[in-house]
């Protein structure tokens, strides 16, 4: 909105030179991040106070670590603040004629809405019973497929492609489109079934991985700051012709605007961390974790870095993998691999303090993200 008012109107139409700075992506990304940060810091106390007034408190599972019982009643659904602090700065600073920006924002809102419904039912029932696992998964798959269809429609207008970029293999770009079917006017969507399925796996996986990581004060949101920061770099270089050519990335000029969305995600996450740091004053709830996971996954799909996402969000992947291994091992062998899953609970039961686990997982997340960025030059 500010981009449209101050650059396209004030500068391009009336040649008001000071507003020329709004054409620069780095400037708008930085200010989107700052806007999101200060929105979180300023609005945060009012949100926490209102959540307390409405008695929207977190229900703690009895089978979880005993040390968590003291957190019962801590305000939850703070993810509403995160989502607002991402969307509003993006609307202010991004070029709203960009299709990818809208896809990312709407995906974030949609995944957040699923989480909001789940949180609301838990609070209303005064128990840890929200949406059924089947309903939750079904809604996530639906949103993911809608995101994929949106990208297919963009692709059919020549602004996107369904190829995979494989890390470390520069010349191998498999296409997830069945090209022979894509030319048929009435059944063309069938040609994109592999792409739809792949996007569904990425988005459902990323949203649930962040959700599983959100078990300790500041853990998930701190890892999100790092992952979103890495995505900010990737979106910028993917949209910059010279950087993209130098690093061997797909040149996609329009995805550069997503760096504003990612910058807003970084600022929003830091602002929320101010109140979510141990001991937490508020929890993000599913409304926050699903929105953030959906946003991260959507951006990765748009910029063709889906296969790099497991490194960008390495801690999220380890947390999700620990649950899969634990459940699989117990069903097949009646034995548990970890003392408790997700992984952070395992370390709690080993005697690590909550603060130590959080900081060490942040460090691991930073190492993963830096490794992901270094792979750009290893292709």
Swiss-Prot record:
Q: List the GO biological process terms.
A: cell division; cell wall organization; peptidoglycan biosynthetic process; regulation of cell shape
Reaction(s) this enzyme catalyzes, per UniProt? UDP-N-acetyl-alpha-D-muramoyl-L-alanyl-gamma-D-glutamyl-meso-2,6-diaminopimeloyl-D-alanyl-D-alanine + di-trans,octa-cis-undecaprenyl phosphate = di-trans,octa-cis-undecaprenyl diphospho-N-acetyl-alpha-D-muramoyl-L-alanyl-D-glutamyl-meso-2,6-diaminopimeloyl-D-alanyl-D-alanine + UMP
- Top-rank taxon of the source lineage equals Bacteria
Which cofactors? Answer: Mg(2+)
| Pathway(s) of this molecule | Cell wall biogenesis; peptidoglycan biosynthesis
- One matching Pfam family is MraY_sig1
Tell me the keywords, alphabetical order.
Cell cycle, Cell division, Cell inner membrane, Cell membrane, Cell shape, Cell wall biogenesis/degradation, Magnesium, Membrane, Metal-binding, Peptidoglycan synthesis, Transferase, Transmembrane, Transmembrane helix
Q: Name one GO cellular component term.
A: plasma membrane
Cite the CDD domains for this sequence: GT_MraY (cd06852)
Q: How does it sit in the membrane?
A: Multi-pass membrane protein
Q: Which Gene Ontology MF annotations are present?
A: metal ion binding; phospho-N-acetylmuramoyl-pentapeptide-transferase activity; UDP-N-acetylmuramoyl-L-alanyl-D-glutamyl-meso-2,6-diaminopimelyl-D-alanyl-D-alanine:undecaprenyl-phosphate transferase activity
EC number, as in UniProt: 2.7.8.13
Q: What is its main location?
A: membrane
Q: Which residues are listed as membrane-spanning?
A: 27-47, 76-96, 100-120, 135-155, 185-205, 218-238, 255-275, 283-303, 307-327, 356-376
The protein's location, in the record's own words, is: Cell inner membrane
Family under the similarity heading? Belongs to the glycosyltransferase 4 family. MraY subfamily.
What does this protein's UniProt record list under function?
Catalyzes the initial step of the lipid cycle reactions in the biosynthesis of the cell wall peptidoglycan: transfers peptidoglycan precursor phospho-MurNAc-pentapeptide from UDP-MurNAc-pentapeptide onto the lipid carrier undecaprenyl phosphate, yielding undecaprenyl-pyrophosphoryl-MurNAc-pentapeptide, known as lipid I.
Query: How is this protein named in the record?
Result: Phospho-N-acetylmuramoyl-pentapeptide-transferase
Q: Which gene encodes it?
A: mraY
């Amino acid at each position: 909105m500010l981009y449209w008012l101050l650059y396209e109107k004030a500068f391009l139409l009336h040649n008001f030179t000071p507003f020329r700075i709004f054409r620069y992506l780095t400037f708008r990304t930085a200010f989107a991040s700052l806007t999101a940060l200060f929105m979180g810091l300023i609005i945060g106390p009012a949100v926490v106070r209102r959540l307390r007034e409405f008695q929207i408190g977190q229900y703690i599972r009895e089978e979880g670590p005993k040390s968590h019982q003291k957190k019962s009643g801590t305000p939850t659904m703070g993810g509403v603040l995160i989502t607002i602090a991402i969307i509003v700065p993006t609307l202010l600073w991004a070029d709203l004629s960009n299709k990818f920006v809208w896809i990312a924002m709407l995906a974030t809102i949609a995944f957040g809405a699923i989480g909001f419904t789940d949180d609301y039912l838990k609070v209303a029932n005064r128990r840890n019973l929200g949406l059924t696992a089947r309903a939750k998964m079904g809604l996530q798959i639906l949103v993911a497929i809608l995101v994929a269809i949106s990208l297919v429609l963009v692709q059919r207008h020549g602004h996107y492609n369904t190829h995979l970029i494989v890390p470390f293999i520069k010349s191998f770009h498999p296409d997830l489109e069945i090209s022979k079917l894509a030319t048929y006017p009435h059944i063309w969507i069938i040609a994109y079934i592999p792409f739809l399925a792949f996007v569904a796996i990425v988005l459902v996986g990323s949203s649930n991985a962040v959700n599983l990581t959100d078990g300790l004060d500041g853990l998930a949101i701190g890892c999100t700051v790092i992952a979103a920061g890495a995505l900010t770099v990737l979106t910028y270089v993917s949209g910059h012709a010279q950087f993209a050519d130098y690093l061997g990335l797909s040149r996609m000029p329009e995805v550069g605007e997503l760096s504003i969305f990612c910058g807003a995600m970084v600022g929003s996450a830091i602002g929320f961390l101010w109140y979510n740091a141990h001991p937490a004053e508020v929890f993000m709830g599913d409304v926050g974790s699903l929105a953030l996971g959906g946003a991260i996954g959507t951006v990765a799909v748009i910029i063709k870095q889906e296969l790099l996402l497991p490194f960008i969000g390495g801690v999220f992947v380890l947390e999700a993998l620990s649950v899969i291994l634990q459940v699989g091992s117990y069903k097949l062998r009646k034995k548990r691999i970890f003392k408790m899953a997700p992984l952070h609970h395992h370390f709690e039961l080993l005697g690590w303090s909550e603060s130590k686990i959080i900081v060490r997982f942040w460090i691991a997340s930073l190492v993963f993200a830096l490794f992901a960025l270094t792979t750009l030059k290893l292709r």
